[in-house]
Amino acid sequence: MANLKLISTSRPKGGETEKITINLGPIDLGQIDLLVEEGFYSNRTDLIRTAIRNQLAVHAQVVTETVTRRAMVLGLQHFSRQDLEAAQTANERLDIHVLGLASIAADVPPELAAATIASVVVLGAFHASPAVKAALAGRIR
């Protein structure tokens, strides 16, 4: 049985969310506004988040199986300067595979990231300094 590494599945708070933009037709938008006016939802965002969570729940088994098959970290994974220095000392190159949020500490120099990170695959959000992202540009998928 494959190992599934759960880091954190807690929902992000406030500033930890990513903004997306969607295009809706006027009829769909009108129906959303009607449901908000009638008190079913507190606002448009509440309805959209609820709908997305419901769809994710429908497909939860597929997500779990795929995360296991792809050997991905589910949740949050953070790499500190010390983590990357330890990998460098051990002559290891990291393949980062995350469904959720992957982040590299702000104090990580681009040279260290380039020397220790072989690839980055993130389904979700990837936070790193612009210099680190530039150093890893050819390795981010």
Question: Across the structure, where does each feature detected by a protein language model lie?
Answer:
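Mid-chain, well-packed structural core segment of small domains
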Residues: 89-95, 109
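Short, positively charged interaction helices/loops
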Residues: 57-90
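Short, solvent-exposed loop/turn at the beta-strand->alpha-helix junction
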Residues: 108-111, 133-134
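Short Lys/Arg-rich basic patches
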Residues: 1-27, 36
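Short, basic amphipathic alpha-helical segments that act as recognition/interaction helices
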Residues: 2-4, 10-12, 30-31, 42-66
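Leucine-rich solenoid repeat scaffolds
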Residues: 117, 125-141
